[in-house]
């Protein structure tokens, strides 16, 4: 696919893309929640709403990764998602990547909440918004600097040509 081997994306570029992605996901989440509320027309279904939101965000990522190999934020920061053979990953691999990117930040959010509750430091719960940054911890231990979910699935983020 590339004349030369793709350049791995720097942590700085991935962080910038992630922050921009968070802004875009606010819009995706808003529209998904609005549609849910209009379709269901009843409150009291928080688990169903969270599932709907999880699916909407997943659809956003999967469609973009499959169609172009990148989301709008990734395109802005010139990032592309590739597999081991420098091609766009297969749909099953993309789905697995989406599912595996959640456990680490969710575990960190849960741990942070437990510490806040145990120490009666409720303001500490505000730091939960920073738990997606926990995705960067494994990059310091991977020889290629990949996220844990990318290492497990066999994908990587590279600088787009």
Role assignments for model-derived ranges:
Residues 1-161:
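Membrane-interfacial and juxtamembrane segments of integral membrane proteins
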């Amino acid at each position: 696919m590339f004349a030369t081997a793709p350049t791995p994306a720097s942590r700085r570029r991935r962080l910038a893309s992630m922050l921009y992605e968070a802004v875009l996901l606010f819009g995706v989440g808003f529209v998904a929640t609005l549609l849910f509320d209009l379709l269901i027309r009843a409150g009291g279904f928080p688990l169903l709403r969270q599932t709907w939101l999880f699916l909407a965000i997943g659809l956003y990522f999967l469609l973009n990764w499959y169609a172009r190999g990148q989301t709008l934020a990734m395109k802005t920061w010139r990032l592309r998602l590739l597999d081991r053979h420098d091609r766009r990953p297969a749909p099953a691999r993309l789905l697995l990547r989406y599912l595996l990117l959640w456990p680490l930040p969710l575990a960190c959010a849960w741990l942070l909440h437990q510490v806040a509750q145990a120490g009666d430091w409720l303001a500490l719960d505000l730091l939960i918004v920073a738990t997606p940054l926990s995705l960067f911890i494994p990059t310091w231990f991977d020889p290629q600097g990949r996220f844990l979910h990318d290492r497990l699935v066999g994908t990587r983020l590279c600088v787009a040509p």
